[in-house]
Amino acid sequence: TLPEDEFIFPFSMPAGLPPEEQIKVAQLDNQEDVAYREHLVQSYGKYKQMISGIHYNFQIDPKFIDALFHAQNETQSAVDFQNNFYLKIAKNFLRYQWILLYLFSATPTVEDKYFRGNSPLKPHQYVRSLRSGKYGYVNDPKIHVSYDSLQEYVETLEHWVKSGDLIAEKEFYSSVRLRGAKKARDLLKKGIQYLEFRLFDLNPFAPYGMELADAKFIHYFILLMAWLDDTADQEGIKLGKARLAEVAWEDPRQQSVY
């Protein structure tokens, strides 16, 4: 519980930032977790550690997936069928995620101190989502992880960890991550169990950061990604990411160009 004179800050982007040296790295019992956060400070700076957002976990009822599996005769393995089902959702989400950003973004500005160097924002300029754009909590643009198959997802993610560009798999900050095991490689045996969506800014008007109506809309949007006839390929995913970056930087008071 909070003292009566303290409140939870309702925005994703921080405000009232103190000098960086006054921000302490979280002290945890597990020293690996402490080392991980110290790495993030070195890579991204302390101010970016102050960003927050909603992680939306989504799982299809296993009984429903099993029923779909037995209603088809193309895929021999139940695990492969489940993986392909979740991969289709993930790929189509990356293709069309900009629509949700347009509807639910809520990080139009931040104080100048947040930026290393001069602010890229012009006076009185507002954008849809600083958090989801290149000035938010994102990986280096060269970090590319393939969603073509679960095998390629695992191998490309492990590549970036081995190269040192990521200190751990959890440093991969995609809008959607494949979940269900502590290590990505374990998914090859267990299969994808659920998806983690990381796109969403906090809704500053919602007590818990997201309204129930918004959560339900996102739920139906994710289901739509499964029911679309087509599955986005790498070019489609690339287009979706480019469009996300454009929409994130648009004036939130105007309609999107799309």
Named regions from a protein language model:
Residues 1, 13-15, 63, 74, ...:
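Extracytoplasmic glycan-interaction modules
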Residues 1-29:
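Active-site acidic/histidine clusters and adjacent loop/turn architecture
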Residues 7-18, 69-74, 234-241:
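Short, glycine/acidic-rich hinge or "gate" loops at secondary-structure transitions
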Residues 19-25, 68, 206-210:
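A short acidic (Asp/Glu
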Residues 24, 28-42, 46, 50, ...:
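Loop-rich catalytic cores of soluble enzymes, especially ATP-dependent carboxylate-amine ligases
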Residues 175-182, 187-258:
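Terminal accessory/anchoring regions of large secretory-pathway or extracellular enzymes
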